[in-house]
């Protein structure tokens, strides 16, 4: 299982399972001399952690991160940073009934086909519990980007089911349990979630993440284009089934005269490209969207098979999110931060001396 690392110069490797003793990660490539404490990481972990509202799973994990290495006297040393979060609220007995049954829509079937066995407790390595370490590592990247380059990364929920959410007020995102930027839609979201809970069903969502202050020039054509790496990072998040950069699939209905981001002496006049042209950042806001499927961990009966090939009826027990998109917001922010920090370090390594007279806005 070699796919546990992301990044080239800023590298994040995670380990751990949903019901194991702990989750952890190794973060390589952090420059020395950056002030860093566990409190710097805890804020985003608290935004992601389970059991914080009635709309998410009631598994209660404090997600208290420990810095094991790479920090001395409050600053980074330039060596590998080891991070650890202990699992404290596992209820593995909830999953004993699915030991030999493949939950439809989950990774049970594919993991067993690949490895010949699987950790059925909460999905094991395939669980979104793993993303806690991505958020911890991403918090390091967010701190570096903000303090060294003035880059701000923000995410929000922009659709739940058939309810579109307009980005009206970023300040509202942290004031409600949905990460919703549209205060007029909070009641509708609450009503939908109550209905889903009553029905024992789930719903999909769309999350948008925006990076402001990104300098022009990030991205490594042709295979490590910035948008390609962002798409790769976001698609690696559990339940994500689609990623768009800028206008994404909406460009299909546009003409070239509409879609091109014209430039005047005052700067770009639009941002259909989402801040990336030719795989390289343009200096505009980087905008990405991701679509998350509705979780299959529901109490609505469904058909599946067991490992003996027998058809059985499946009802998933345990503690699950009726809409996984809610807690995906800080995860999306973290993954975008990881990619941007990696590309900033790569740009600095190759092109630190490049100077141009081309205007920047």
UniProtKB/Swiss-Prot annotation:
Entry binding sites for FMN: 125-127, 238-239, 278, 293-297, 319
Catalytic reaction equation(s): 5-O-(1-carboxyvinyl)-3-phosphoshikimate = chorismate + phosphate
Cysteine pairs bridged by disulfides in the record: none
Gene Ontology CC, one term: cytosol
Keyword Transport among UniProt keywords: no
Matching Pfam families: Chorismate_synt (PF01264)
Catalytic class of the enzyme: lyase
Role, per record: This reaction introduces a second double bond into the aromatic ring system.
Protein name from the UniProt record: Chorismate synthase
UniProt gene name: aroC
